[in-house]
Amino acid sequence: MNRPSGRAADQLRPIRITRHYTKHAEGSVLVEFGDTKVICTVSAESGVPRFLKGQGQGWLTAEYGMLPRSTGERNQREASRGKQGGRTLEIQRLIGRSLRAALDLSKLGENTLYIDCDVIQADGGTRTASITGATVALIDALAVLKKRGALKGNPLKQMVAAVSVGIYQGVPVLDLDYLEDSAAETDLNVVMTDAGGFIEVQGTAEGAPFRPAELNAMLELAQQGMQELFELQRAALAE
């Protein structure tokens, strides 16, 4: 098995997390997984959705989008079509669920955090890059809210990261790029905490069904890659 990028089966793409990437948001990063590049911002607003009012806790929600020419051919903006596509809705819900798992919302006060993940260049793994980058932006945003005195304590329970794994040419591989993803027999997206817990596992067989042993091999690869991602997040936050 030869990967198009020349990487080993258990090798992540080169990853970079650049903090404070935009001026106005409470937290922002540019996250790069190889040629996939996503701007993640976290905006804080006072108040919560109606279903949470008066309960003394906060909320976090997420939106996801792709620039029209983030892909090989231009895609029409969803705004010009008048509605979001099913893929977009699925991904932004995944991002929101994943980031909420990192927080104790009761310590957020009655504040809402808006996660915005905008893909400026896509080469596979945009949802996993978004979650990994948005976690760092979230931690920066919480630091800003702490300075403002808006928090009841430290809402952060754990770090969160995500990575893709799959079966490519019969072999489990880590962190698929677009060429691999489009030809993979199986594609799996894994979201985990730095304590080793799973938040979400999304898996689909594109060719032949995958066997339990292959699923276990992919999950082991994901766990291995996740440790590297948490180290990269911590290194970015230490800068």
Curated annotation (Swiss-Prot):
Which GO MF terms are attached to this record? 3'-5'-RNA exonuclease activity; RNA binding; tRNA binding; tRNA nucleotidyltransferase activity
Instruction: List its EC numbers.
Output: 2.7.7.56
Q: Does the keyword tRNA processing apply?
A: yes
Q: Which residues bind phosphate?
A: 87, 125-127
Which CDD domains has this protein been placed in?
RNase_PH_bact
SUPFAM superfamilies per the UniProt record, alphabetical: Ribonuclease PH domain 2-like, Ribosomal protein S5 domain 2-like
Q: Which reaction does it catalyse?
A: tRNA(n+1) + phosphate = tRNA(n) + a ribonucleoside 5'-diphosphate
The reported effect of residue 69 to S is: Still forms hexamers, wild-type exonuclease activity at 30 degrees Celsius, nearly wild-type at 50 degrees Celsius, decreased binding of pre-tRNA
Alphabetic keyword roster:
Nucleotidyltransferase, RNA-binding, rRNA processing, Transferase, tRNA processing, tRNA-binding
Asked if the keyword Oxidoreductase belongs to this entry, the reply reads no
Q: What does this protein do?
A: Phosphorolytic 3'-5' exoribonuclease that plays an important role in tRNA 3'-end maturation. Removes nucleotide residues following the 3'-CCA terminus of tRNAs; can also add nucleotides to the ends of RNA molecules by using nucleoside diphosphates as substrates, but this may not be physiologically important. Probably plays a role in initiation of 16S rRNA degradation (leading to ribosome degradation) during starvation.
Q: Which family does it belong to?
A: Belongs to the RNase PH family.
Please report the name of this protein according to its UniProt entry: Ribonuclease PH
Show the taxonomic lineage: Bacteria, Pseudomonadati, Pseudomonadota, Gammaproteobacteria, Pseudomonadales
